[in-house]
């Protein structure tokens, strides 16, 4: 009871969406239009940009989903040097360009694999339709590991560069859904980091075959086996830094916090 407190005002801020729907343009702020990421304003191949500039952090909805993530997949589907595309699909929009680009890629001779989560809440029927369309296009569709829900949002592109094969990746916190990308606050990363590419290769092998990876992940922390122990270890590390008088900081961005062990660790750290 000592940890329960009252606040003045609303708790369910989502109810304010009803006010936004009122037809009073004179009371509305100007519409927000996502900006192109400054590093992606270059019209060269997005793969050249990622290779030369390095990892690109995306912040949606402030930065455009269309000119970053959708562009990444669009160019991958038509680039003659791209050999393969692998992707997880949890939720997408009815008028999804993502699906179109995957179909285009298959028709252009790329090897395309999509892991579709059929138990995505409220979108089960839609995902079955998407899976059928992808399979009809000749795309290899799998449905994840039995007993687990595939909630990760990742794309892996294998491209033949001037010096050999290179893996390009997108890792995001939000769905590949153009509509919610204009509303929800999410982060994404475009990168060709070799370690991340190798980790994603292992992850897709696991998601498509069920075989446990033969090596440890170097940079990714996939749930359910790796993420929680790693977070607890990192929280403890920062606690030890603080005790020793060294700089220490913990910053989390999350949709919700429900795990009791993580919560307890954060209390101890604070």
What are these regions (language model features)?
Residues 1-250, 257-259, 267-268:
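N-terminal localization/anchoring segments of enzymes in phospholipid and broader phosphate metabolism
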